[in-house]
Amino acid sequence: MSLFEELIEGKKKDKQIVKSFETKETLSDQIFEEQKKGHFVMREDIRKKLLEISDDFVESFGVDFFIHDVVLTGSLANYNWSQYSDVDLHIIIDFEESKYEMELLKEFFDAKKNVWNEKHNIKIKGFDVEVYVQDISEDHISSGVYSILHGKWVIEPKKEEPNIDDRKILEKGEEYGKKIDKLVSIGIKKDTMTHIEGLRKKIKEFRQSGLETGGEYSYENLTFKLLRRNGYIQKLLRLKTALTDKKLSVAQ
């Protein structure tokens, strides 16, 4: 495939991804069943399987923590689910109940999450499972949160018809994509890590500002989702890993 064909194919895929942000008429019938008109509950076989997965993840901690809840959040717990959705499984823990320092706990759980997610390739009805440890006091902006532990909605989603500006999302996504491609093309140099961390911070703050002002359907959050689904976030993280590996290696 030529470079031109790759660019055309990439733009086509991006448009398909942005199209997937549109809301559906119902929640995913692979995960939920309609109990009564407009009210959905999680399928019991799915709920039990997700509890098994969360138990396996919690066992990997090697330390006892009280689990306040296990929840499904993200697009799969909402009307904007699509083929690109993940099963976002959040384990809710109160960090203040621990004797360990907050920053140490965050680093510990992030490390456990990364190792577990990389080690496993679990799918629920074709959707990838991603686990995460969430502090009970953490601000988590989501209009759909389902308690798997208790079998009920913490926040029941409402069907909305958001005004999604496809062009704006695609343009911003392309802008960030070019910046990431430029870093990759430059390769591993002395100041590359500084640029990577700077861009990661910029993207994170860009997304967070959108979540705080416009919620899940803000163009900032949807631009981030585009970058994650088209592989650009992973491309940036792979470059960071390659740089770290080179820094820690000793040449023959």
Residue ranges and their predicted role:
Residues 1-11, 19:
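Proteolytic processing junctions in secreted/extracellular precursors
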Residues 13-85, 93-252:
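Catalytic core of pol beta-like nucleotidyltransferases
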